[in-house]
Amino acid sequence: MPIIIISSDSYETGREISKKIAKATEYNYVDREILAPIAEKFNLQKGQVIKALEETPSLFGLSAKLRNRLLACIEEATVGKLLGDNVVCHGLAAHLYVLGVSHLIKVRVLSDSKKLASQLSSEAGGSADKIETLLKRKVKKRKQWSLDAFGLDETDPSNYDMVINLSQIDQDEATKNIAGMTVYRKFQPITYSINCLKNKDLACRARVVLMEQFPDVKVRADGSTIVVEVKIKKRTKQKIAGVIKKLAGGVNGVEYVEVHAASDFR
Amino acid sequence: MEAKKLKIMVIDDENIVGKRLKPALEKSGDIVETFENGESALARFDEEPFDIVVTDIRMEKIDGIEILERVLAKSAHTKVIMITGYATVEIAREALSKGAFDFIAKPFKPADLRAIIKRASKELRA
């Protein structure tokens, strides 16, 4: 069955509607609960891992190196869950890194900012207008974050299969519409899209292993072959290629490793 | 009881594809005919329908999507499998919404195609 990825300008709204969709479709729900093992691996609080999904690197926040490693681990964990099929995924930015998979339905849910602001104002105090301005600022920050982390603008509607504005359509109706998309033939899994997801999974797993020593590494996979791009000086190329081949060769599912010296790193 | 042999049509303008797939698919005992363009394939399909059509998408004059539409218009039960070296989400979704049974990106192993054909034949025999 198709996989549904929900992105929203409000984490709470996205979570609420995603849970409803999961219930309506009887799919599994995947959200930030899967981040606990990553926090444990890095000896961090879960909140610090979540920062990687929300904040750009800064002097007083996460370093770029740690942020990138955390994001790589989040990608790996998320893609592993998506392979399980029958999934509604939210809060893990999967819409920004799982690309080219035709049975993945990407939906952007726009919250009713006025309603959300007045709700927050009655809960926490402060004027609704001020809170609405803060929410708008948060969306701008999110856009910046998505461009910095994955080179994609998550507020751009062209990155989605459907965009729903909750100020115009109520949540239950939206849930019905999104769940209804799962029966469309065009979104059913096919050999091509399943292979794309498997390739992504293998590349993510290999990248996580390699990043410990090669933070800027790029990996793509095709079947059991992986292609690794890494910054290498000419004189050390052979030695480093050997290390990469040994490390990546130990990843379950990898049979052949190609190593290329990277020419263009974003 | 022995299962009825399937009639499989392979269409690809690169003749190496047909040459390699024909013996690989015939291993299962099915009847395989190969074509290098849409015109001759559709003319043959007009003579008698096939159970399974495996077609490339990017071809001159008649492309794989047109073949898919014309085959299904003539024989709704035929399973059409699309193969392409230029796979994209958009093309895959277009092919599926027009009724393709499955879609696989080139290069692939003959065993991958055999697995798809096995699924198609199960549906045909159900």
Task: Locate predicted features.
Chain A
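Small-molecule kinase domains that catalyze NTP-dependent phosphoryl transfer to phosphate-bearing small molecules
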Residues: 129-171, 198-202, 207-208, 216
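Short, structured interface segments
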Residues: 170-188
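Short edge beta-strands and adjacent turn/loop segments
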Residues: 211-235
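ATP-dependent small-molecule kinase phosphotransfer cores
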Residues: 35-86, 126
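Short, non-transmembrane amphipathic alpha-helical segments
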Residues: 206, 235-259
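Glycine-rich phosphate-binding P-loop
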Residues: 4-21
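Conserved phosphate-donor/acceptor-positioning beta-strand/loop module used by diverse small-molecule
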Residues: 100-123, 131, 135
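N-proximal, solvent-exposed amphipathic alpha-helical segments enriched in charged/polar residues
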Residues: 188-217, 239, 243
